[in-house]
Amino acid sequence: MAKENVYSSLGEHRKKFMSWQMRTILVTMIGYAIFYFVRKNFSVAMPGMTAEYGITNKSFGWIIFFGSLTYGFSRFVNGYTVDRYKGRLVMALGLLLCALSNFAFGYGANLSSLITGVDSGPDFINILILVMGVTIIVNQFFQGMGYPPCARILPHWIHPSELATKMSIWNCSHSIGAALAVVVCGYLIGSMGTDLSNNAEVVAAIQGNLDANGVKDAANQALVYAAHIGAWKWCFYVPACLALVGAIGIYIGLRDEPKEVGLPDLPDTGLGGLKDGGMSAARRKKFEAVMVWKNRWVWTFCIANLFVYVVRMGVLDWGPKFLTEARGLDIKSATWTTAAFEIAGIIGTLFAGWATDHFFKGKGHRMCVVCMAGAALFMTIFRFLPADAGITPIAATLVGAGFFIYGPQALIGIELGNQATKEASARANGIAGILGYLGSGLAGLLVGYIADFFGWTAVFETIIVVAIIGMFILISMWKAPRDGYERAASINYNNE
């Protein structure tokens, strides 16, 4: 149905409806981007915490692992919460609580000193890691209150005939938020803090921490970090303040449904016979069994999603750290490079969708194979860059990797909807989401351990292997159909 035909039936309400539609899209995009400001700031703060306290990659890995699992659980729980409460209330409250947890993280060192009575030593560090871990896990639970409200609110304002197009644009919000987060926090950590670079004892302590963690050019890096003691805290304070403002903006700017502002519902979006009971419970159970639980294409996509997330989060979560420690970049250059990886992902996502329709006739799984091969290729180039490679080749290879890895991340969700059909899309994507968050957690755990015990080169090699495995998993479904509607039509309900 053409856009004009869809909205022209709203009559005199059309202009007001379109205004509220644009407002809803913009507010949710900005709001969800701010969620990433109080989520991805941790990645930028990690190098500073290693320098000042000697926190190991293994410890960070465990924090990321449990945080990712908590986020996945929260997304699942809050998917039900938004059906009972106003989506704008859940989203605004979630961002408010994220702001408070970020303030708490910034004061983590003070709290650890209060608990232990000291501000250094093994006991202090252990309590600090515990406090940070608990705070990140709590923050990740509140993070899970961000996406479900958007998934519920937007279909009330956007007609199904253009939902995919506008949601693909909306989906760039997390990439925009993550990119801006690492850039802003990179500036803060390189500009704020107390200058103790003239204190030989402080510089020596920092160099010892960096040497213990295998940081490249530790002597010069120690002077840089000593000039900005405590700057990592600002990576939490500033985004937290932004989140407070964002929470207020979300609550004021959003409305869950058109009727809340005196507008009619979108035409042709009633529940219809299927959701009103047209399919019996027994038939629905069999439908989901065939289209989801016994659908090998669904499971292939879900398993591949785990590998996609390991590659993506292995770079995004750890980028600032391995670029400073393994490649010797300063923190500002490292964060700009990580941001470029994320921005390239936006372009790659849009290109992957376009290429799927124009070159592969809607068969997104084939485009995913190309993307995983591209990601593996660019990570291989990155692995073999010379030790003295400048920022240009380093950034170029990570931009290439980002361009390719974000294609599968977006396409898998769309393709699951096609393979499971729209009636079982949510269930199929739920499974993929759980495995994706597991992959994110494993990326944190694996990278932390491998970096500490085998070095960053082994980390890059692991990411390459994971990308190749993901590619072969997707190759196994090269001959899969474009969608599962023919399969759904052939289900035999006679023996239900």
Language-model regions, residue ranges each:
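Residue-level signature of mid-helix packing/kink "hotspots" within the transmembrane helices
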Residues: 40, 68-76, 178-179, 342-350, ...
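Cytoplasmic helix-loop-helix junction between adjacent transmembrane helices
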Residues: 135-174
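C-terminal ends and interior cores of transmembrane alpha-helices
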Residues: 96-125, 373-387
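Juxtamembrane intracellular "pre-TM" segments in multi-pass secondary transporters
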Residues: 7-18, 260-300, 492-496
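Extracytoplasmic gate region of multi-pass secondary transporters
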Residues: 42-46, 295-350, 409, 444
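C-terminal transmembrane helical hairpin of 12-TM major facilitator-type secondary transporters
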Residues: 362-412
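Glycine-rich segments within core transmembrane alpha-helices of 12-TM secondary carriers
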Residues: 165-193, 345, 433-443
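Cytoplasmic membrane-interface "Motif A"-like loop-to-helix N-cap segments
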Residues: 84-95, 358-372
